[in-house]
Amino acid sequence: MDDLERIELSAVLDFFAAAPPDVLHAFDLAVLDLGDAAAFSIGAHPKMLLFNRVLGLEEGDAALPQIERWFASRGCTFAVSIRTGAVLEGVLDERGYRRGTAFMKFRRGVEQPPVRRSPLRTEQIREERAGDYGTVVAALFGLGSPLDRWFAALCTRARWACFAAFDESRLIGTAAAHFADTLGWLGAAGTLEDARRRGAQAALLAARIRAAGDAGVRLLATETVDRVDGIPGPSFRNVLRAGFEEAYVQQWWLPPE
């Protein structure tokens, strides 16, 4: 597991650890410790692969039967996220797994990105606006409560920095960053549909890069859906414009149906 996967796994595990007790029970959250790797699950949404996934699995298939039994016991499907070209791909293929969505992993230092003019302002979210932040994130996911309280909890959690973009007083975009020593991960970014194409995500990327530098981070990681038919999506283009470079493709593998 390299630094890009390591900080992603750190972010996901700390996100699950941040869930308030009522959210933990309402969503039936669980984590399976696999040593350097982990499986995590949201039982209330058994087909939601983002939160029913395995990260950090190394070459070999020793843990796969345990993982399969665990997700089956929870009634959830899942995805195994691994780097394209890893030996484990052959093992998964032999077990009847199939390719799902591919994500591009990106990396960069904490040098400031080019300044882009925007009519929007960005602000780090503290306790007093955490509820508003969570409400918008939940709306972007289309899940509502209690997802709002889960994301709101990150705004005051150590090793996290949550930012929002505002159109005057209206909160229209959200994004989060997780820091662990000299590594940082950027994710959970989105903009309300009626406010897109106004530079919100570019501004939020810049704000998080600055925060990462202030926190002592030296290497930043993020990921977004890979090119489709060779064409990058808006998120992919935003990340490149912010100075990230493509590292490699992370493939999601789905178990046999």
Labelled PLM ranges:
Residues 1-72:
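N-terminal charged segments
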Residues 1-18, 55-58, 103, 112-150, ...:
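Short amphipathic alpha-helix that is part of the acyltransferase structural core
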Residues 23-33, 75-77, 100-102, 154-164, ...:
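A short helix-loop-beta-strand connector motif used in the catalytic cores of GNAT acetyltransferases and
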Residues 143-194:
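A conserved beta-strand-loop-helix scaffold within acyl/acetyltransferase catalytic domains
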Residues 57-121, 126-128, 222-223, 228, ...:
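Acyl-donor-binding surface of acyltransferase catalytic domains
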